[in-house]
Swiss-Prot record:
Keyword hit for Glycosyltransferase: yes
Annotated positions binding 5-phospho-alpha-D-ribose 1-diphosphate: 128-132
Protein name (database record): Xanthine phosphoribosyltransferase
Binding of xanthine, residues: 20, 27, 156
Cysteine-cysteine disulfides: none
Sorted UniProt keywords: Cytoplasm, Glycosyltransferase, Purine salvage, Transferase
Family the entry assigns: Belongs to the purine/pyrimidine phosphoribosyltransferase family. Xpt subfamily.
Taxonomic lineage: Bacteria, Bacillati, Bacillota, Bacilli, Lactobacillales
Described function: Converts the preformed base xanthine, a product of nucleic acid breakdown, to xanthosine 5'-monophosphate (XMP), so it can be reused for RNA or DNA synthesis.
GO cellular component, one term: cytoplasm
Localization per record: Cytoplasm
Length: 192
């Protein structure tokens, strides 16, 4: 998605450890117009698929997830990183490792929001090593849902998460696929 790639090049900051900081439009402050375009693009990419629900993970997955769900006309559910006191005990759990925070944690979705046989589209803000996606796939499988595919706003394809998704036999679509970081610059797949 050219618009997204241009925004990453303009406003993104490459940090040590192959981390891309895009806090000005996705991971802290959100650009709703850009996220609406993200939702439209995921709708276009997954056209023809029967999708009943979008599954994402809090917090940065919510903006692209809700815009995608809005475009598709379906509900969105997000996996929580902590179980609030208002959640009952009927919960699907999965372990995830945060690449940027360097901590293991659990994510959860209340069972009443995922139903056997539902067609689920997983949307994530970043897919690097794919830990959050692995957790969401695990939760969708616990609920006996059909996973239509995984959509990443940004994929760092050199870190293996997108390969894991494909190795699981799942469709993977990324709106901005990063091949490498060199000299503090982002290099997208297909660039010279």
């Amino acid at each position: 998605m050219k618009l997204l790639e241009e925004r990453i090049k303009r406003d993104g900051e490459v940090l040590d450890g192959n981390v891309l900081k895009i806090n000005s439009f996705l991971n802290h402050q959100v650009d709703p117009k850009l996220m609406m375009e993200v939702g439209k693009e995921f709708k276009r990419l997954f056209a023809g698929e029967q999708i009943d629900k979008v599954l994402t993970c809090e917090a940065s997955g919510i903006a692209p997830g809700v815009m995608t769900a809005y475009q598709l006309g379906v509900p969105m559910v997000f996996a929580r990183k902590k179980k609030p006191s208002t959640l009952n005990d009927a919960v699907y759990w999965a372990d995830v490792f945060s690449y940027t925070k360097k901590v293991n944690s659990k994510i959860c979705v209340e069972e009443k929001f995922l139903h056997e046989g539902e067609n689920i589209l997983i949307i994530d803000d970043f897919v690097a090593h794919g830990e959050a996606v692995k957790g969401m796939v695990n939760i969708a499988k616990q609920a006996h849902c059909n996973i239509v595919g995984v959509g990443a706003v940004v994929a760092k394809t050199f870190q293996g998460g997108s390969d894991w998704v494909k190795d699981e036999g799942l469709r993977f679509e990324s709106l901005a696929s990063i091949a490498s970081f060199k000299d503090g610059q982002v290099h997208f797949e297909g660039e010279e």
